[in-house]
Amino acid sequence: MRRGRLTEGGIFHVYNRGADKREIFRDSDDYLRFIHALYEFNDEDPVGNMTYGFAKNPTRISMVDFRGVPSLKPKHPEKLLVDVLAFTLMSNHFHLLLKQRKEDGVMKFMQKIGAGYALYFNEKNKRSGVLFQGRFKAVEVTNNEHLLHLPYYIHTNPLDLNTDGVDEIKFLDSYRWSSHMDYCGWRNFPSVTQREFLLEFFDGEKNYRKSIAKWVKERSKNLRKIRDVALEEFAIFFFVITFGSQLLLSVD
């Protein structure tokens, strides 16, 4: 099995889910905690205390109130491990689109996320054992078609919920646990993501809004397209990240 490295400056679709497909986000506090972790752990400096907030109230975020518009200041670009381009959280899994800024930045960032959030979740729920289903997976974006579709794919993931009879765009506009609202220009979690790259790619917030509405109308067709692209990419760029190594796997 050959060893590989995640390309510095590369863009990666990162995802993981709960062990045995169990819920990893049980309530709003869990979603908020993970989203704050996306901000807090995106730093080359070590995090002093991964269990912050347990002493007073283990079910609430003590450092920032994400229930309103967050007042967190954007971090200095030189300190970032990755650019968080897009994200969506579902009850039992998550999708991230990351651009690596530092050597091993994706691995270090996901180590912090995985360890920190699992520690919080286990402490809060008085449980032990693994939370995630193995190591996180990362697929490198190697062509413009992949890059064009992945943000839509990630942001429309909540439509996999039972949305029969619901206006799909309105549903996405009201789904808070993603970066979709911020790309539309509505302040949701603006300090968490670095959106300039994709907004330039999509030619601004208004055009993003129009283009995702068009993408949703042909979602079934577009999903087949993105899965075909992903399968092609998997054969070459399917990485399993471990805490000490990065293994390049081939998929038949």
Name the predicted role of every residue range.
Residues 1-190, 199-252:
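Short catalytic/metal-binding and nucleic-acid-binding patches
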